[in-house]
Amino acid sequence: SGQRMAIDASLIEADANKQYSAPKDEWDAARVDRGAAPRAVKEYLDTLDEAAFGAATPVQPKFTSFSDPASQWTAARKGPAFFSYSDNYLIDTDHGVIVDVEATRSIRQAEVGSTKTMLDRVKAKFDLRPERLIADTAYGSGPMLGWLVDRKIAPHIPVIDKAGRSDGTWSRADFEWDAKNNQYICPEGEALKQFRRNYSDPNRGPTGKGVAKYQALKHTCQACPSKPKCCPKADCRKITREEHEDAREVARAIRKTDQYKVSAKLRKKVEMLFAHLKRILGLGRLRLRGPCGANDEFLLA
């Protein structure tokens, strides 16, 4: 039906070895002789500016393979590190059918970015736009959730949230968001505002972009009986709000529904397809090198 889709990625070992690699302080792509380089190295140079490979992150890998430099050195399996590519699946959960496949570097930024690529490609080729997208926490960043909500796709995805506190004091979740007045309301009923004045120049006011800071009045917090539960070490309480916080709240609200429980079960169908790929088809290690070789093998499998 194409209404409920799920996405995930799995590591596939590349045809590369640590013995034939260079540490990051000895690797320089600018020194590679393109004329004498093999196909896999030329493809690496061609994809340095692509979001799925070279441009996914400015951080250089710890090691780079001479034979397949586009592969990613990773220890994501909690064991010995190895060179790999990520096989990204977009599936229709109602029928367990793979709708699209994309090969990327084995880092979260590239895997999450492939989601946008595959959803746009499926829309262009098959005119499919899912009602919901199911994924794990790796895909729960603010920009990703905002991208989905803007396209009217319900994010059935756990939110990456580091606002929780372990010392027993109130976290951001304990404060109520008042969208109409652009402020937070604390459990004691006091307002935390971003600005407490009207600017004659609109360019100095709130922009709605980046991280916004909301703060209570100092004398209000000092006289509050709940200050030990709120901000025991600060003069007043401050809360930050991300640019895509509205989309994150949409995802949090979805997580409380019964439909989310159904989606959590449907997500397992992606893992079943990866198990079939590795155990039945035996694709635990790639035979071809380079981004194109990895993509071709993933498509054929």
Regions found by a protein language model. Give the residues of each.
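Anion-binding and metal-coordination hotspots
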Residues: 1-301
